Amino acid sequence: MILTVTMNPSIDISYPLDVFKMDTVNRVAEVSKTAGGKGLNVTRVLAEIGDNVAATGLIGGTNGHFLLQHLPQNIQAFFYEIAGDTRNCIAILHEGQQTEILEAGPTIAAEEVNGFLHHYRSLMGATDVVAISGSLPAGLPTEFYVQLVEIAHQFGNKVVLDCSGVALQAALGSPVKPTAIKPNNEELSQLLGREVSKDLNELKEVLSEPLFEGIEWIIVSLGADGAFAKHWDTFYKVDIPKIEVVNPVGSGDSTVAGISSALSHQVDDYSLLKKANVLGMLNAQEKMTGHVNVSKYDNLYNQITVKEV
């Protein structure tokens, strides 16, 4: 089973408007509300491609119950309930633009942190891959994801970690490493304190730095240029076909789903990289975030090339 972890989920609310007027009333004809969070996007995609997937994380209040009710029926939900209310994230779509209002989310009490860790540990026996995604809510220490990685490894489980900032820095600085990470160029630049380009030789040097030592898989998205990857000491370049992008939001999460699925099925390097990239591309072709059209999978998969460099 693949277990996804979303520590700071949300109810994603979308308000489409022809014109957004400041300092007055704006009336909305239709509202879209979905269970949101990077980990839940991963969960939905894994369910759509037929993997055995379960979701955990923190939920609370009426929003938490709404989130549970709006998960697909074929997803096992093992969320841990907290006192605070799950946050709202509002997107106002207007004049071809998007204005976002993001709540910070609840502050997690110390006893809730300990309670979740005990709950998380109880799920490890039925799990083979853990996919951890997104930001940490207030109250959780910056090294919290390190604790989750360590517990997973105690049970022999692989971990795909998709986070940024201090949480990622803490994970990279720990002696306990995730199995796979997928930073982009911007995140690499932030980690190293210098500009990192898409030049393959530079990426080879960057991913060979001591900061990344001990991580089995590092997959760097290059957008329309595909991806660059390192598996232990072997480097790969992934080339992808041109596609019509409808909505790129959630493509990184879909890539995480592909990595997690491939690790669970223990496929070879080439198959892992193709699966990760095809799911990211399929998501970008859809209006809905965290959704893929599996009927297009094989055709697109066969157009992706992977070569050792």
Curated annotation (Swiss-Prot):
The keyword Cytoplasm does not apply. It comes from the Bacteria. GO terms for biological process: D-tagatose 6-phosphate catabolic process; lactose catabolic process via tagatose-6-phosphate. It catalyses: D-tagatofuranose 6-phosphate + ATP = D-tagatofuranose 1,6-bisphosphate + ADP + H(+). Pfam families: PfkB. GO terms for molecular function: ATP binding; phosphofructokinase activity; tagatose-6-phosphate kinase activity. SUPFAM superfamilies: Ribokinase-like. Keywords: ATP-binding, Kinase, Lactose metabolism, Nucleotide-binding, Transferase. GO terms for cellular component: cytosol. PROSITE patterns: PFKB_KINASES_1 (PS00583), PFKB_KINASES_2 (PS00584). Its EC number is 2.7.1.144. Pathway: Carbohydrate metabolism; D-tagatose 6-phosphate degradation; D-glyceraldehyde 3-phosphate and glycerone phosphate from D-tagatose 6-phosphate: step 1/2. PANTHER family: 1-PHOSPHOFRUCTOKINASE, 1-PHOSPHOFRUCTOKINASE-RELATED. Belongs to the carbohydrate kinase PfkB family. LacC subfamily. This is Tagatose-6-phosphate kinase 1. The gene is lacC1.
